[in-house]
Amino acid sequence: NLSSHVGGDVGASTAWQAGLSYLGTSPQNRTYRDVDSTGTEVTNGFSGRTRLLVLDGVLKWAPNNNPAHTNFKLQGEYFRRSENGGLTYDTQAASLGTRSGSYRSRQSGWYAQGVYQFMPEWRVGYRYDGLNAGTTSIGLVNTGALAAAALPILGGYAPRRPTLLADWSSSEFG
């Protein structure tokens, strides 16, 4: 696992930081529950290689580097996960029987937000975040051993969510 951050000041009122992180693991029989195409709850397992890349950044502004009265903070992160290994369907043989095949996937997620303190004790902000199920290659589906409907949680999903913030804090300790 690796992580690195750099940053600095821009004038007397602005600071920034950017980072890059890489995490890797090799799970063995990492399980998750799903409901297959027959409506039966099944437990599936993944074994293989998982890699996660994270990019992050923050920009802070405060007049004369004094955030007590007015300040603004812009930050965001991007995540990308890739997996390569084997997928075991229905490890408990609760439905269509246990089957195994290859599995490759890439998913991503991100958020960006800005928070502005316009006077002591008051802040407003906006955040937008999203996930992307990305691309998957499921050997059991590609060979026709299972229908994609048997693994619905691995299907495409790309939610987006906007969030507004209005905050009043009666003290600096919240």
Model-based region annotation:
Residues 2-8, 55-59, 112-116, 126, ...:
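Residues on the lipid-exposed face of transmembrane beta-strands in outer-membrane beta-barrel proteins
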Residues 9-18, 62-72, 121, 171-173:
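Short loop/turn motifs that connect adjacent beta-strands in outer-membrane beta-barrel proteins
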Residues 16-20, 55, 70-76, 112, ...:
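Transmembrane beta-strands of outer-membrane beta-barrel proteins
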Residues 23, 46-92:
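Oxyanion-binding "anion nests"
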Residues 29-42, 84-103, 135-150:
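Outer-membrane beta-barrel translocator domains and adjoining extracellular loop/strand segments
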